[in-house]
A protein has these predicted regions:
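Structural recognition of alpha->loop->beta junctions
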Residues: 29, 78-90, 124-135
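Active-site-adjacent beta->alpha loops and helix N-cap segments on the catalytic face
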Residues: 40-56, 69-74, 91-105, 114-124, ...
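Short, acidic/polar
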Residues: 17-29, 72-79, 117-125
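Conserved N-terminal beta1-alpha1 strand-loop-helix module at the mouth
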Residues: 1-64, 68-70, 85-87
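Hydrophobic "anchor" residues on beta-strands that sit immediately upstream
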Residues: 59, 106, 131
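Active-site regions of enzymes building and remodeling cell-envelope glycoconjugates
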Residues: 14, 33-34, 104-107, 154
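Short, conserved beta-strand edge motifs with alternating hydrophobic and charged residues
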Residues: 63, 90-92, 108-110
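Short catalytic-loop micro-motif centered on adjacent basic/acidic residues
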Residues: 36-37, 109, 133-136
């Protein structure tokens, strides 16, 4: 798989996460934003939302778990691949990451790192899931993220 997504994030690690059309319009007009995380929409609007991002020359990543009318099953990823121009997905579901990778889509596996069990879960799952990136929430955890980066080879 091409490294376009990884290179875009490396070049500019600020990623726009949009929750509504107003935020989408604003980030599409900013030249320093290369990647857009789409955190809203439904099955009727997602193709148009993605099209706006692509017309602005940006990488479109859809948070599958937040799109109205989509299940959190592999068929949802196939729907997005076949009906939108999305470059990839964001999800909390390892099975959806696997499916997206099969379809040559970029992947971000989102974890909520709330305790040591969740931490161990990240370490064990990343060997079988192989996302392009891991997103760790809550975001204000620099010490834990630094420790995690020392233990795994996937960009965090």
């Amino acid at each position: 798989m091409e490294r376009i997504f990884w290179e875009a994030v490396e070049e500019n690690p600020i990623i726009a996460a949009v929750k509504n059309m107003e935020d989408l319009e604003k980030c599409c007009s900013l030249s320093d934003i290369h990647v857009v995380f789409i955190l809203f929409g439904d099955i009727c609007s997602i193709a148009d939302i993605v099209q706006k991002v692509k017309e602005a020359g940006k990488i479109a990543m859809i948070h599958v778990d937040l799109i109205g009318g989509l299940s959190t099953r592999e068929i949802a990823v196939e729907f997005l691949k076949n009906n939108t121009e999305a470059d990839g997905i964001i999800t909390t579901k390892p099975a959806l990451v696997r499916k997206a990778r099969e379809l040559s889509m970029y992947t971000v596996l989102r974890y909520f790192l709330l305790d040591s069990m969740a931490y161990e879960n990240i370490l064990s799952q990343q060997h079988s899931v192989h996302p392009d990136f891991i997103e760790v929430l809550p975001g204000a955890m620099p010490k834990v993220i630094h420790r995690l980066c020392a233990e795994i080879k996937v960009p965090v």
